[in-house]
């Protein structure tokens, strides 16, 4: 038998945010079994906690219903919050395929209510398929250069002129499915408050409630293009249009040619617990 918890990540109340199933003590499971379990759970991601291979507190493997991911934001934040219930430590180091990710845990009345992570520093380049992407999104232009960031997942960013325009998006998901191995992040806002929507048929996600791995790159994107200062924390609200409001905080420190830290944080709550017989 294997025990699991479901954490609603980037949420302050159950049934908000982005859910992740976290399986503990998964060392006896094969990669094939993990993939089949993730398909059975049918959430956007499921994580498996294994004994560390290096100097971390645990090794984490992340699966969507269709493939394994080297890194993902909301699954790792949810996993850190789940593991925090089993330790008094205020810091956790979780090993992933993209390296060891450091977490700071925030507690209230003894319970972990939030976590912050140091994300991998991404690389970026122009997408080069702007016209095709804009047509798939049903819009004529982007308010920012369309660029793709890579920090494990690959995230494309498209700017919208207003929150209303962002909410009105109705993408052609069949056309978006031709953008292989990438997620399309559309955003709007100003100052420190931004809204986002993420579409990724290529990753098996029609629309994501909270894309933590895109939050850090969005902060970089905004700073690189003069909308915020490097080191300034922003709020990113996502999932509103699908009834799963999710609040993320992100900050990129350094400068465009020498980033020193990418931090993403948010709350999380336990939604449920269970056991599988396997």
Curated annotation (Swiss-Prot):
Please identify the protein, giving its name as recorded.
Trans-2,3-dihydro-3-hydroxyanthranilate isomerase
List the InterPro entries: Phenazine_PhzF-like
The record's catalysed reaction(s) read: (5S,6S)-6-amino-5-hydroxycyclohexa-1,3-diene-1-carboxyate = (1R,6S)-6-amino-5-oxocyclohex-2-ene-1-carboxylate
Tell me, what is an example of a GO biological process annotation in this record? phenazine biosynthetic process
The Gene Ontology terms for molecular function here are: trans-2,3-dihydro-3-hydroxy-anthranilate isomerase activity
Q: What is its EC number?
A: 5.3.3.17
Record GO cellular component, one term: cytoplasm
> Whose protein is this, by species?
Pseudomonas chlororaphis
Tell me the function of this protein: Isomerase that catalyzes the condensation of two molecules of trans-2,3-dihydro-3-hydroxyanthranilic acid (DHHA) into the phenazine ring system. The final product is not yet known.
């Amino acid at each position: 038998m294997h025990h699991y918890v479901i954490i609603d990540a980037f949420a302050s109340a159950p049934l908000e945010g982005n859910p992740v199933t976290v399986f503990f003590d998964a060392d006896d499971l094969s990669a094939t079994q993990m993939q089949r379990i993730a398909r059975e759970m049918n959430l956007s991601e499921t994580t498996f906690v294994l004994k560390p291979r290096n100097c971390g507190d645990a090794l984490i493997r992340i699966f969507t219903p269709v493939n394994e991911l080297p890194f993902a934001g909301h699954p790792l934040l949810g996993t850190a919050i789940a593991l925090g219930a089993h330790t008094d430590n205020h810091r956790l180091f979780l090993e992933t395929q993209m390296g060891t990710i450091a977490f700071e845990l925030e507690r209230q009345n003894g319970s972990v209510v939030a976590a912050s992570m140091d994300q991998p520093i991404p690389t970026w380049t122009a997408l080069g398929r702007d016209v095709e992407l804009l047509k798939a999104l049903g819009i004529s232009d982007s308010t920012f250069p369309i660029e793709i960031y890579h920090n494990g997942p690959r995230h494309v960013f498209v700017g919208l002129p207003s929150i209303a325009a962002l909410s009105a998006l109705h993408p052609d998901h069949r056309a978006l499915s031709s953008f292989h191995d990438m997620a399309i992040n559309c955003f709007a806002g100003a100052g420190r408050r931004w809204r986002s929507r993420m579409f990724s048929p290529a990753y098996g996600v029609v629309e994501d409630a909270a894309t933590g791995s895109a939050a850090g790159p969005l902060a970089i994107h905004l700073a690189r293009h003069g909308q915020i200062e490097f080191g300034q924390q922003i709020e990113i609200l996502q999932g509103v249009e699908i009834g799963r409001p999710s609040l993320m905080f992100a900050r990129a420190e350094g400068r465009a040619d020498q980033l020193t830290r990418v931090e993403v944080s948010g709350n999380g709550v336990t939604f449920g617990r269970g056991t599988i017989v396997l």
